Curated annotation (Swiss-Prot):
This is Protein C'. InterPro entries: Paramyxo_C (IPR002608). The keyword Protein transport does not apply. GO terms for biological process: symbiont-mediated suppression of host innate immune response; symbiont-mediated suppression of host JAK-STAT cascade via inhibition of STAT1 activity; symbiont-mediated suppression of host JAK-STAT cascade via inhibition of STAT2 activity; symbiont-mediated suppression of host type I interferon-mediated signaling pathway. The gene is P/V/C. The C protein is found in virion at a ratio of approximately 40 molecules per virion, presumably associated with the nucleocapsid. Y1 and Y2 proteins are produced not only by alternative initiation, but also by proteolytic cleavage of C'. Only alternative initiation is detected in vitro, whereas in vivo cleavage seems to be predominant. Residues 12-34, 51-71 are annotated as: Disordered. It is found in: Host cytoplasm.
Length: 215
């Protein structure tokens, strides 16, 4: 059959051969063009999918702008921890020492005058003698046994300082009134029930400061 086709091709006029050759060449070009077009479309589609995948992917923290950077968690925790940190002991001491400074001007003057008399005048000597006798006669506790064993000058100084602390605790704030005075005593009452020596000293401070409180 192939020989018959070849024989027919040989017998075919030359102009017809040219037409067939041109047609065959055109078909080959059209086929090659379609293949290139399909390949180009496929490449574009792949590039599009790759681009979409990149845009949809997560961005690493290092590529974020500075104003959108992720917060540093350890610093946040450290800040929260510092906000809940307990006050230092020295801060508590300073707060107690400044209680008397918060009183009204008149009460502050009377309070400082009273404290000065305790440290320098006969009132202080009378106070420490009264406190010593009351502590000596009270029910024995570790603190009540320790105070009589102190050297006399040290014991007197300790009792005066404890009295001053209670005076500044009771007389503070904007013009202390009798109801405030009573309320402050009630605040410290649970503590005084456990510390009997402090209760005796506070009661003497109460007695000394009563005239400062305004009705």
């Amino acid at each position: 059959m192939a020989s018959a086709t070849l024989t027919a091709w040989i017998k075919m006029p030359s102009f017809l051969k040219k037409i067939l050759k041109l047609r065959g060449r055109r078909q080959e070009e059209e086929s090659r063009s379609r293949m290139l077009s399909d390949s180009s479309m496929l490449s574009c589609r792949v590039n599009q999918l790759t681009s979409e995948g990149t845009e949809a992917g997560s961005t690493t923290p290092s590529t974020l702008p500075k104003d959108q950077a992720l917060p540093i968690e350890p610093k946040v925790r450290a800040k929260e921890k510092s906000q809940h940190r307990r006050p230092k002991i020295i801060d508590q001491v300073r707060r107690v020492e400044s209680l008397g400074e918060q009183a009204s001007q008149r009460q502050k003057h009377m309070l400082e005058t009273l404290i000065n008399k305790i440290y320098t005048g006969p009132l202080g000597e009378e106070l420490v003698q009264t406190l010593y006798l009351r502590i000596w006669a009270m029910e024995e506790t570790p603190e009540s046994l320790k105070i009589p064993q102190m050297r006399e000058d040290i014991r007197d100084q300790v009792l005066k300082m404890k009295t001053e602390r209670w005076l500044r605790t009771l007389i503070r704030g904007e013009k202390t009134k009798l109801k405030d005075f009573q309320k402050r005593y009630e605040e410290v009452h649970p503590y005084l029930m456990k510390e009997k020596v402090e209760q005796v000293i506070m009661e003497e401070a109460w007695s000394l400061a009563a005239h400062i409180v305004q009705e």
